[in-house]
Amino acid sequence: MHPLKNLNIWGDGGFIATNNKKIADKLYLLRNHGLVSRNNSKIFGYNSRLDTIQAVVANYKLKNKLDGVTKKRIKNSKLFDKLFKTNPNVKTVKRFPHLKEVFHLYHINVNKRDQLQQYLISKSVDAKVHYPIPIHLQTAAKYLKYKKGDFPVAEKLARTSLSIPVHEFVKEKDIKYVVKLIDKFY
């Protein structure tokens, strides 16, 4: 429930839902330093407790906001899909009809990504590059001994992917404006 995610609260937080008692019991321990009593930890865990006010906000948003946010993001992403169909320079994410896809970010894959981003920003569009370094080239993955060229698809996506606003506050006219700008750029 990071402030920038689809369902957010007034800070960082989260929840896990499961119908598996074994998993639930383990997670319950992990969220509170593995404590089984005030002074005894069964396992090493984390401080992952949500404070009361955050929990109240999260509970309210789950009950009253999630469906609306989800529907709006799906609607926005489908409009982008439809409008980009006529631009051969823009590749969108493949959709799977049997899945309910709710976009946190709407990625397009384009040549001249960085130039397009600067152009969109100059026109007040919040275009961002997310994930510019593929996982296998991250410092944390160095021990795996992968090198540039080992995952060419991931590397191409890292070079060409651009995120454009798809959140629930984006209006239809805003989406059409963004698409028009991108069409004009190419």
Q: How does the language model describe each region?
A:
Residues 19-186:
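PLP-dependent aminotransferase class I/II
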Residues 9-11, 155-156:
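Short hydrophobic "helix-edge" motifs at membrane interfaces and signal-peptide entry regions
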Residues 1-10, 37-42:
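Conserved active-site segment immediately N-terminal to the catalytic lysine
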